[in-house]
């Protein structure tokens, strides 16, 4: 499979801009919000179709090409007066030939040949620099001789006139101006000092400077030596040196703090499998999430077993916000409760609160690295937030935990993979999951989780048809899994099959009516087909399920901004700006019940 989407390899030798494109094709997926589809602006930007030149343009081009040296746009008359005024204080400056006179080649050659270059660069001869400056060639002449050729040639780059003309203009000036300046340099070297005289003069100047430096260095060395002797004498007289205890004790303490205290961590990192090191590399190379923010008002803090209450709420279809509070109480009572952290993360993800879900799932994996459910849920959350490399590395860790023989065999063939971009990492992890899927090809013992992992990988690479096949294969094994139906619906929606996606979301809500994310996705699909009122009803229904009895929405630590922002879009699509003003954190959803059913 090929995962390269760019076409920068075509004609790279003829188009320098394609080389620039290759430098900008680095993986920055950790800095993006979502997986974006192909940009519609590329088609317009690469157009090279140009219309036929009009008669007005032809006349303008003819006038421009017929312009002689007399119509130059470079006028140095004002600069000549400025230089004359500046040099009047130090001496008389020779008159600069006018621009029209400069165009006379014979007179200019006689003036140029009659000049003499100053043999030295002493400060008293600084007034001669003005004369030397005046003897330089006129850039205006070079532009007049050059003509409009390079600019016209550069305007033909399809859709990119500025980049197309910049490089030819620069190269044209260099090529045409270089022959004009080379004779000046050759004539100037005739009156320069010969090699022997130049070396003698340089030695004299270097000797004068060296003597000053030598005196300064000797003075500094003397002062340093005196200061060192004084410090040594004071130390010897006031406090004898204790060689046995002076330095070694401090060195040993620093060694204990910096090395021995971190020995376990260092050994764990050194002895850990290669896939484990890759996991830490890719997951840590993203924006760090803060610690999980707990709700202040939690009615389950006084309950003796809040974890049990949370599990019951999830299994019986209770409100996800209440189940999240129960799991929060459980982890606050026991911060090392890995299963509670994992269920809290899964609950928040289903409640359309991705950030707290990632924080909780990462905490679970830190406590229990082999928690397969948390690893799979975390990879999905990473994908939703656009952290694709972290998602792929998490899937590899999941596979290494459940199918170590597949990963170990691949690692033995290529122990250390080095730095990989998004496409290389995706290709390698996808190949590993395909090998794992081939372990049960008959379909009877198919691993639904392997199919889910493959579906997430294909989804991240925008291969939606393959992802749909994988999720359908997983649903064939677990037809009552609401999560699978929701993931199938999201994949169908991204492949522009909104009607089929709506059916999948309905199935997910039929299995779990409190599934807030499925309601949110259903509202988005309704927006895509222009059913704004139905979309508003689903979004308002999802927001109503965030309501917790006895707790105000505006004081919740974890809120879903996606729901509020999408609801505003719906009201704008309905041209109901009066309703847009009512949407915000802490709003009372009951105020919309007069117009919407939810």
UniProtKB/Swiss-Prot annotation:
<keyword id="KW-0472">Membrane</keyword>
<feature type="compositionally biased region" description="Low complexity">
    <location>
        <begin position="220"/>
        <end position="233"/>
    </location>
</feature>
<keyword id="KW-0963">Cytoplasm</keyword>
<dbReference type="InterPro" id="IPR019734">
    <property type="entry name" value="TPR_rpt"/>
</dbReference>
<feature type="region of interest" description="Disordered">
    <location>
        <begin position="1"/>
        <end position="54"/>
    </location>
</feature>
<feature type="repeat" description="TPR 6">
    <location>
        <begin position="482"/>
        <end position="515"/>
    </location>
</feature>
<dbReference type="GO" id="GO:0005052">
    <property type="term" value="F:peroxisome matrix targeting signal-1 binding"/>
</dbReference>
<feature type="repeat" description="TPR 2">
    <location>
        <begin position="338"/>
        <end position="371"/>
    </location>
</feature>
<feature type="compositionally biased region" description="Polar residues">
    <location>
        <begin position="9"/>
        <end position="22"/>
    </location>
</feature>
<dbReference type="InterPro" id="IPR011990">
    <property type="entry name" value="TPR-like_helical_dom_sf"/>
</dbReference>
<feature type="repeat" description="TPR 1">
    <location>
        <begin position="304"/>
        <end position="337"/>
    </location>
</feature>
<keyword id="KW-0677">Repeat</keyword>
<feature type="repeat" description="TPR 5">
    <location>
        <begin position="448"/>
        <end position="481"/>
    </location>
</feature>
<keyword id="KW-0576">Peroxisome</keyword>
<keyword id="KW-1017">Isopeptide bond</keyword>
<feature type="repeat" description="TPR 3">
    <location>
        <begin position="372"/>
        <end position="409"/>
    </location>
</feature>
<feature type="region of interest" description="Disordered">
    <location>
        <begin position="135"/>
        <end position="154"/>
    </location>
</feature>
<comment type="function">
    <text>Binds to the C-terminal PTS1-type tripeptide peroxisomal targeting signal (SKL-type) and plays an essential role in peroxisomal protein import.</text>
</comment>
<keyword id="KW-0813">Transport</keyword>
<feature type="repeat" description="TPR 7">
    <location>
        <begin position="516"/>
        <end position="549"/>
    </location>
</feature>
<feature type="region of interest" description="Disordered">
    <location>
        <begin position="208"/>
        <end position="237"/>
    </location>
</feature>
<dbReference type="GO" id="GO:0005778">
    <property type="term" value="C:peroxisomal membrane"/>
</dbReference>
<keyword id="KW-0653">Protein transport</keyword>
<feature type="cross-link" description="Glycyl cysteine thioester (Cys-Gly) (interchain with G-Cter in ubiquitin)">
    <location>
        <position position="10"/>
    </location>
</feature>
<feature type="repeat" description="TPR 4">
    <location>
        <begin position="410"/>
        <end position="447"/>
    </location>
</feature>
<dbReference type="InterPro" id="IPR024111">
    <property type="entry name" value="PEX5/PEX5L"/>
</dbReference>
<keyword id="KW-0882">Thioester bond</keyword>
<feature type="compositionally biased region" description="Basic and acidic residues">
    <location>
        <begin position="23"/>
        <end position="35"/>
    </location>
</feature>
<protein>
    <recommendedName>
        <fullName>Peroxisomal targeting signal receptor</fullName>
    </recommendedName>
</protein>
<keyword id="KW-0832">Ubl conjugation</keyword>
<dbReference type="GO" id="GO:0005829">
    <property type="term" value="C:cytosol"/>
</dbReference>
<feature type="cross-link" description="Glycyl lysine isopeptide (Lys-Gly) (interchain with G-Cter in ubiquitin)">
    <location>
        <position position="22"/>
    </location>
</feature>
<keyword id="KW-0802">TPR repeat</keyword>
<dbReference type="Pfam" id="PF13432">
    <property type="entry name" value="TPR_16"/>
</dbReference>
<dbReference type="GO" id="GO:0016560">
    <property type="term" value="P:protein import into peroxisome matrix, docking"/>
</dbReference>
<comment type="similarity">
    <text>Belongs to the peroxisomal targeting signal receptor family.</text>
</comment>
